[in-house]
C-alpha cells in the first residue's frame, strides 16, 4: 500500500500539459519554418538544449529533495518536476518575447544581463542546495539514531511518522521559503529563481539571431517556437524525474522499518549531492569574483556540471534498486521485527 493509493494517476495532467507544449512548439516551428527552413535546425537544437538542461545537477538535486520532503508530509509530489521546469523555462520565454519586440535592445544589453543574471542564479542555486544539504545532514543523523532505537525496542508506525515529520522543525533555520513548499506548485517560483542565470535564456535568444538575416527574417511565431520547444524538452524530463522519484520513494513507506531504512539510504545521497553541488557553485562564484588563483581554485573552476546531473539521476535510481535488493535478500525487515 502506497502513501498515495488514490492518486496513482495524479501525474497524468502534467504529462498532458507537456504533450500540449510539444504540439504548440512544433506547430509554431512548422508554420514559421515553411518560409525559413533554417529554423527547423534551430528548433531541434532548442529542444535538445531543453532536454540537456533538465539534467543539470541543480535541477536533479532540487527536484528530488523536494519530492522527498513532500512525501514525508504525505503530500502528492507528482508535479514538482513539472512546476520547477515551468518556472525555470518561463525566464527563457520572457526573454524571447523581449527579443521579439526589441531585437536591437537585446543585442546591446544581453551580455550585461547574462553576467548579472548568471551570478544571481548561481548564488540562489548554491545557497539553496547548501541549506538543503545541511538540513538533510541533521535529518540523516536523527534517522540513524531512530533506526538504532527501532532495533532495540518496538515503535508504532504513528510514532515513526511523528518523529519523521518533526524533523520539519529544523526547516525554521533554513529560511522561510523552504518552509512554504508544501505543494508541488510551490516550487514554481524556485524554478524561476534558478532560471535567472541567463546562460540558457541567452542560448535560445541568440539562436533567434543566428540566422544572420535582417530583423524580419524570422517571424514572431518562429521566435516563440524556440523557447516553447526548450520548455517542452526540459519539462518532459523534469516531470518524469519527479514522477519516477515519487514511486521510488513510495516503496519506502510500506512499513516503519522500511521507511526508516530507505530514508537513511536516500538521505545520505541527498546530503552528498546537495552539499557538493552547492559548495562547488558558491566556490566557483567566489573564485571568479575575487580572482582567486592556485591549484585548488583551478580545480574548482575546471569542474563541469554537464555530466554531473546524469550521474545524479543514475545514483538515485541505483540507490533505490540496491536498497530494494538488500532489503529482500538481507531480510532486514525480518531481523528488525524479531
Swiss-Prot record:
Record InterPro entries: Ni/Co_transpt, Ni/Co_transpt_high_affinity
Transmembrane portions of the chain: 11-31, 37-57, 79-99, 127-147, 187-207, 217-237, 266-286, 307-327
Name of this protein: Nickel transporter NixA
Topological type in the membrane: Multi-pass membrane protein
Function: Secondary nickel transporter. Required for full urease activity.
Species this protein is from: Staphylococcus aureus (strain NCTC 8325 / PS 47)
Leader sequence segment: none
GO molecular function: high-affinity nickel cation transmembrane transporter activity
Keyword Transmembrane helix found: yes
